Amino acid sequence: MACCESWREALTSGGPVRFAWDPCVYEPSDDTWIAVEALERLGALGYRFESVLDLGSGTGVLAAVARTLFNPSLVAAVDLSPYAAKATRLTLGPDSLVTQCNGGRCLRGRWDLVILNPPYLPAEANEVKACEGLLDLAWSEEAGHEVLCRSAGDLGNQVVIVRSSLSTLDVDSCLSSMGFSKVATLSNRAFTLERIWTELWRRAA
């Protein structure tokens, strides 16, 4: 498996965060930075988390940002793609807990915070067949949005989820049916053809 990674940098309220990127991994875009804004807002509000899971990590930049902002005792990341798992491991360091698997099926226990920026585009909107079709999985909602949503509900006490007006998944029903309530909208941005926002959900006591 070839990996032609390069290094990028994201500026956050906690300082710069370096992350590895590979052409076969979803490149951080508007939805990523809106998720970063959400994490920054949680930090500004005084939230702290002892354990953080980045579910569908891609480059691992959101896990790295969470580590910078919250200084948790444990940060872990999961992605189906071997390219993404490798990039995330480079981003977080050789001793990091990074696993390649589908959703959270390889994990047990509960995490204080699960971060989820899921694939949400219709399958026909971005048919990328390069990289053994793995890049397409990072875009297309059909490939696993509901699987990831339910994994987040299984594993998290609180969930930060990125949402899009282009998505057809009923996220409210997905998380509500698993005992979660929406706490707040953390960031919200409108574009020409799309609105992207992030929400914080919390498991009922």
Give residue ranges: language-model regions.
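Short alpha-helical
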Residues: 27, 61, 82-83, 146, ...
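Glycine-rich, phosphate-binding/catalytic loops in enzymes
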Residues: 69, 94, 130-134, 177-178
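Mobile active-site "lid"/loop adjacent to the S-adenosyl-L-methionine
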Residues: 118-147
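Conserved Class I SAM-dependent methyltransferase catalytic core
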Residues: 21, 37, 143-201
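SAM-dependent Rossmann-like transferase core, predominantly class I methyltransferases
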Residues: 2-69, 104-107, 184-186, 191-205
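Conserved SAM/SAH cofactor-binding pocket of Class I
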Residues: 36-109, 113-127
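Residues at secondary-structure transition points
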Residues: 27-30, 79, 130, 142-146, ...
